[in-house]
Each structure stands twice: as structure tokens, then as C-alpha cells.
Amino acid sequence: QMCAFKSGGLFKASFQMAAIIAGVKKDLLEALSEFGQSLGLIYQIQDDVLNITENDLSKMKGLGEDITEGKISLPVIYAMENLPKEKSKKLAQILSLHSQDKKLIRQAIDLINEGQGIEKAKIVMEKLFTEAWEKLNPLLDDNEDKENLYSLAKFLITRQV
């Protein structure tokens, strides 16, 4: 829900406004709105993944900043579901501390990885993209704009910054 309200709503509104200005038909407006919502969710999930993986973004923002904030992201949720009870409790405990201790942050990241939180979050991103694109694709003309939209969406899933 947090993702839907945060980035999902912004992307959805952007797509809706562009579609309304372009004067598209209702079915295309709805598909574009849903696609925008999905892209926003994908963007936020990827941002959460990047925060707990070593990459250019985490070098700028700080690795595990979301852990320090105690953020319950999608990778954390999946990890907690998949970890044994004691390890899930340990992850929850670390998050509740809002600690900047690098060892605790590393331990939390290791637990998220052990619980396959990142892998499952990536599966969700691909599913969101595929479902939204399958609804939108047949409504769009085959042209460079369609290819650019597809490329932008795929970039959001694979971006490293």
C-alpha cells in the first residue's frame, strides 16, 4: 500500500494527465493509468532493492538507509515470510532499532538475502510489468513511441541508480 500511494500514484496521475491531454479513448486511458500505477510500484520496489544492494545509488545514499529508518519494504516482507521464525524476529528487531551500526545493517541485509527477499521482489516487478504491458500493448500503435515506452518500463526494472 505504501508503494501504491507513494510512487504508484504519481506515475498513475502523470500517465492519466498525458492521456487526457492527448484525448485518448476510455479503454486506452484506463490501460495507461494502470500501466502508470504499475511503473510507479516497480520504481519503488527497485528503489527498495537498490537500497540494500551495493551499487552506485547505495554509494550515494548509503547502503541500508531503509534499514536504519526501519522501513518494511517488499524485500523485507518476503524475507520475513521465508526465514525461520527466529531469524525473522531478528530482522524485525534490527529494523526496530533504527540503528546506523554498519554491522547490524549488514546482518539485516544478509537476512533479507537469506530469506530471498530481493529475488521475490524482482519476480513481483516482472509480473507487474508483464500484466500491465499485456493490457496496454494491443491498444497502442506499433511505432517508435511504443518502443520507447516499453524500453523506459524495462529500464525501471533493471536500473542501478
Report residues per predicted region:
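All-alpha prenyltransferase/terpene-synthase fold signal
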Residues: 1-161
